[in-house]
């Protein structure tokens, strides 16, 4: 285990919807990579308990997706609160990356950050203010070299840990085919 300000923190959340004022975080996962995108460690993967009233706020897409993935059942069985998730995630990150050093990394990560800001501000403050958003590169590729998108596909399980693995693999793909650095 090597703490480094060059390590990158990848995070993914699953939520009951898209509005942090109405919806809740239902799953969180983190991965730390080095600057070359080699996975150093996987953090806690936590389904966060929510009431039936909160789960009822999910639209059909969320209900179907999170039920089919098994996440809804994990949420119902979970004893973890948001505070537990914050505490465990920060304890993991402190072993790998100094506070404020890593940008928040992921796909459409601005949405996750909005939820962290509202529901887990202590964790949100652990990240540098910058973003490493893989979806930005995807959008540029879609416009400038759309043929390259055919060479990569994600699992799309909508489980937090799987989604992070997809994001890291996608950025590796872009590095190899676009950046050639």
Curated annotation (Swiss-Prot):
Keywords in alphabetical order: Cytoplasm, Exonuclease, Hydrolase, Nuclease
Compartment(s) where it occurs, according to its Swiss-Prot or TrEMBL record: Cytoplasm
Main location: cytoplasm
Molecular-function GO terms, alphabetical: 3'-5'-RNA exonuclease activity; nucleic acid binding
Domain of life, per lineage: Bacteria
EC code: 3.1.15.-
GO CC entries: cytoplasm
HAMAP family registered for this protein in UniProt: Oligoribonuclease (MF_00045)
PANTHER family named among the record's database cross-references: OLIGORIBONUCLEASE, MITOCHONDRIAL (PTHR11046:SF0)
Matches recorded under NCBIfam families: PRK05359.1
UniProt similarity note: Belongs to the oligoribonuclease family.
Designated name of the protein: Oligoribonuclease
Organism: Photobacterium profundum (strain SS9)
């Amino acid at each position: 285990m090597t703490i480094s300000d060059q390590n990158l923190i990848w995070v993914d959340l699953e939520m009951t919807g898209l509005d942090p004022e109405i919806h809740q975080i239902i799953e969180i996962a983190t991965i730390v990579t080095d600057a070359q995108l080699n996975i150093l460690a996987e953090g806690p993967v936590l389904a966060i308990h929510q009431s039936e009233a909160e789960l009822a706020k999910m639209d059909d897409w969320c209900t179907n997706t999170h039920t089919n993935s098994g996440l809804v059942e994990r949420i119902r069985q979970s004893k973890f609160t948001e505070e537990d998730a914050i505490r465990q995630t920060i304890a993991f990150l402190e072993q790998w990356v100094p506070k404020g050093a890593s940008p928040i990394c992921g796909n459409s990560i601005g949405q996750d950050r909005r939820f962290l800001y509202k529901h887990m501000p202590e964790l949100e403050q652990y990240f540098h203010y910058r973003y490493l958003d893989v979806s930005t590169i995807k959008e540029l590729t879609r416009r400038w070299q759309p043929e390259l998108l055919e060479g990569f596909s994600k699992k799309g399980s909508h489980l937090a840990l799987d989604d992070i693995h997809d994001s890291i693999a996608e950025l590796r793909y872009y590095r190899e085919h676009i950046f050639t650095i």
